[in-house]
């Protein structure tokens, strides 16, 4: 049986290919991919590469689909199961996996990186992914597009869980893209009184307001962000700040906004050639500030994300603005890069 799939090579090129579906090995299953979201990291891989992704790899890691074939030894899945698949696949044996930090696994395997991804009509799930990875069954009532959002939402949950505390009066989010909006959608869980979203894209800020994700929105080119935050917080500063972008100066600004014992989560990684940010150790010392980072998610966080989406506590459909068949993947990638979309979904079998 022939499948179609998208591969990336080291020259910033992507190509649509076709080939025989591989024979399953012991412990493997075949997934008919119904939905796969485009992540900013997919675009980053295409443009800049990634040490974990070899040329010719099938990328895409925000996945939902149906099991169509299993090897004889699999007991926890059956043909016809509808599932959501996340990205990070832990080994389950190293120090980090054994201490609740599976996304920091020493081996650091991931779907769409070392393992084939979801821009793919039929995807092979290997034994490690099935046994240790973020593979969760979904109900018959759950839309595949919604289920594919569990991966990025799980990363947002990880960001909050790295923030130490369980409530924050004022949360500031730099970036109104898909991640920024998902972070905002989780703010009520953390009892936020003020949710402030900052982005230069007026269209995205309008969408934030329409979705009722914030109490305040600002364009950083139109106002002095620090002054505005201090007005809102009676000069106390923000209790939690997320940098949902890859802009060096924003990382420095984010730290400067912190209240005493405030937390900043440097969610968006910077390009390799970015200059190091400057941090005042005295600011950290006297503010008792916490500077954290987060990347990826654990299988348990993927489970939590799926529960939020299936329960409707996070309204997944509000994030999806564009859907494309696999044959229009290049147009889909351009749309996802344009700033006009929130979440772009690929339907490989459309």
What are these regions (language model features)?
Residues 1, 252-256, 260, 298-350:
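C-terminal hydrophobic helical "lid"/dimerization subdomain
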Residues 93-174:
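NAD(P)H dinucleotide-binding glycine-rich loop of Rossmann-like/cofactor-binding domains
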Residues 140-222:
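Mid-domain Rossmann-like dinucleotide-binding core that forms the NAD(H)/NADP(H) cofactor-binding site
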Residues 226-231, 272-321, 330-331:
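C-terminal substrate-binding/catalytic core of Rossmann-like NAD(P)-dependent dehydrogenases/reductases
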Residues 258-274:
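ADP-ribose/adenylate-binding Rossmann-like module
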């Amino acid at each position: 049986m022939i499948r179609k799939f998208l591969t990336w090579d080291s020259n910033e090129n992507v190509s649509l290919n076709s080939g025989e579906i591989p024979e399953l090995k012991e412990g493997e299953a075949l997934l008919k991919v119904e939905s796969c979201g485009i992540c900013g990291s997919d675009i980053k891989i295409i443009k800049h590469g990634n040490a974990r992704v070899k040329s010719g790899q099938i990328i895409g890691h925000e996945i939902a689909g149906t099991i169509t074939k299993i090897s004889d030894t699999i007991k926890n899945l059956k043909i016809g199961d509808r599932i959501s698949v996340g990205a990070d696949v832990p080994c389950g044996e190293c120090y980090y996996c054994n201490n609740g930090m599976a996304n920091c696994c020493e081996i650091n395997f991931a779907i769409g990186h070392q393992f084939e991804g979801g821009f793919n009509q039929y995807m092979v799930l290997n034994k490690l992914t099935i046994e240790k990875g973020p593979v969760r069954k979904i109900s018959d009532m759950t839309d595949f597009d919604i289920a594919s959002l569990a991966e990025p939402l799980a990363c947002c949950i990880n960001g909050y869980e790295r923030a130490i505390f369980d409530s924050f009066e004022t949360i500031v989010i730099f970036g109104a893209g898909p991640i920024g909006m998902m972070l905002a959608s989780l703010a009520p869980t953390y009892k936020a009184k003020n949710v402030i979203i900052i982005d230069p894209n007026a269209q995205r800020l309008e969408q934030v307001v329409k979705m009722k994700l914030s109490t305040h929105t600002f364009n950083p080119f139109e106002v002095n962000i620090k002054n505005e935050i201090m007005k809102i917080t009676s000069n106390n500063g923000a209790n939690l700040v997320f940098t949902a972008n890859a802009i060096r100066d924003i990382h420095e600004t984010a730290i400067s906004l912190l209240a005493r014992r405030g937390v900043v989560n440097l969610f968006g990684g910077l390009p390799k050639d970015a200059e190091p940010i400057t941090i005042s150790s005295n600011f950290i010392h006297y503010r008792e500030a916490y500077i954290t980072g987060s990347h990826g998610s654990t299988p348990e966080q993927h489970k939590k994300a799926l529960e939020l989406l299936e329960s409707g506590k996070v309204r997944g459909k509000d994030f999806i603005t564009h859907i494309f068949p696999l044959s229009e993947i290049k147009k889909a990638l351009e749309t996802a890069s344009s700033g006009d979309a929130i979440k772009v979904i690929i339907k490989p079998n459309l």
